[in-house]
Curated annotation (Swiss-Prot):
Annotated ATP binding sites: 30-33, 51, 87-91, 415, 478-480, 494
Stated family: Belongs to the chaperonin (HSP60) family.
Record's GO cellular component terms: cytoplasm
Keywords: ATP-binding, Chaperone, Cytoplasm, Isomerase, Nucleotide-binding
Quaternary organization: Forms a cylinder of 14 subunits composed of two heptameric rings stacked back-to-back. Interacts with the co-chaperonin GroES.
Domain of life per record: Bacteria
Protein name: Chaperonin GroEL
Primary localisation category: cytoplasm
PROSITE patterns (alphabetical): CHAPERONINS_CPN60
Transmembrane annotation, as ranges: none
BP term (GO), one: protein refolding
EC number: 5.6.1.7
Amino acid sequence: MAGKEIKYSTKAREAMLAGVRTLADAVAVTLGPRGRNVVIEKSWGSPTVTKDGVTVAKEIELEDKFENMGAQMVKEVASKTSDTAGDGTTTATVLARAIYEEGQKLVAAGNNPMAIKRGIDKACEVAVKELAGMSKPTKNQREIAQVGTISANSDETIGNIIAEAMEKVGKEGVITVEEAKSMDTTLDVVEGMQFDRGYLSPYFVTDAEKMVVSLENAYILINEKKLSNMKELLPILEQTAKAGRPLLIIAEDIEGEALATLVVNKLRGTLNVAAVKAPGFGDRRKAMLEDIATLTGGQVVSEDVGINLEGITLGDLGHAKRITIDKDNTTIVDGAGKKADIEGRVKQIRAQIEDTTSDYDREKLQERLAKLVGGVAVINVGAATETEMKEKKARVEDALNATRAAVEEGVLPGGGVALVRCLDALSKIKIKSEEKLGVKVVMRAIEEPLRRIANNAGVEGSVVIEKVKNETGSFGYNAATGDYGDLIAAGVIDPTKVVRFALQNACSVASVMLTTEAMIAEKPSKEEPAAMPGGGMGGMGGMGGMGGMM
């Protein structure tokens, strides 16, 4: 078993700082509209070209185990900021490096790291309050497009498509990003509720050319169990035939005699009917059937609630103005559910989203919520090559997350200016002198994103910072044009949530690193030289006799 190597105090923190610097230097080049690309080698296929901070951070593994620990801790900042706010990974990395670097100088000079940590925490708290006070809600589609454009590295097409998608499906709607088959980036919007189950038999098709089923003003029978016995279905089929309206049957499965009878009646023209399997599995299937029932004003036929198939009437069926079914999907548009019932169901799903700890469950609950309140928009990302496609798709996903964050908590002047505007509030904090050092660390660090944006644009960062400090409000440096002015008016805005999480996560990890006193890593095992092959192979000479086999 390999032994352990241990480093203490200054040596440990210096090794960590070397790792932090290596990672932060690679990530920081991507910051701002004039940020540069990073090319990442892949073990197969073409290299990845990216301007996304978290993608760069995830690729970095350092050979020195102590330096690597520092790099991994800052990588965690980037990942966490990306997961919670959807963007701001590069800002978070730049801040974490600056806070740790400044703090490490003070600790190396003999100051108390715990007091510095308390100062950093206090400064972070005050800065977050200041950011909340500066924040303005997104007023219109134009501002949403501006946030998307900035997060997609100044690509206006992406910003406009995201804003259009949000307008069409609402703030709660699901927006997914797919790879397009062409070079154009387009938006498809599905109104109503769509689930991934197609017709059970092609004989249900009403449009043979498009191979789709279209039902207008239709009843919907929602059944939890399998249907195989026709006898159970007959009463309700007779009632719908008398009413002269189409019928959609949703059930766990429909097979045997039941499916055959439905197909025969459809072909004869006795009954305009279609059947699909219920979406989802297990408990999620039950919940989705309840969602469909709420949306269409029907009842789920289930023994659990004492409703059986033979006893139901037309009043128990759901109803929708239009239903479209193809071989893969069913879309229900304009269900007849009561508004109050739908709102109650939405409230219930929102509460479940708040309570769940599983990312997978949260994603599925959000999909259900979107299907009830808005619809689904699909952004199809097009590009000339696969390399460009991957890079563009990552930018669209970033921009989408940032836009959602902006709608949630509002926006701030971008370009690192919002953080610089916190300096005034930080300078007024009254705490013990040693803790005050921690506040000064944060005050120096929050200038760093603006300095880096300016440096990446080929301008001296310190000059830009002084000019911005001498003004107030949303006055700042627009790196895209090289001009100074009102950044909010120029459309250079950042989501409040993104800036807040970047600062909080950076302060958190930098504090942990500053208060580190020992680091433990495995000693690299010495490679044993390979043994020479034994001399017993000489006996193979006897194989010469094999010649007689020829």
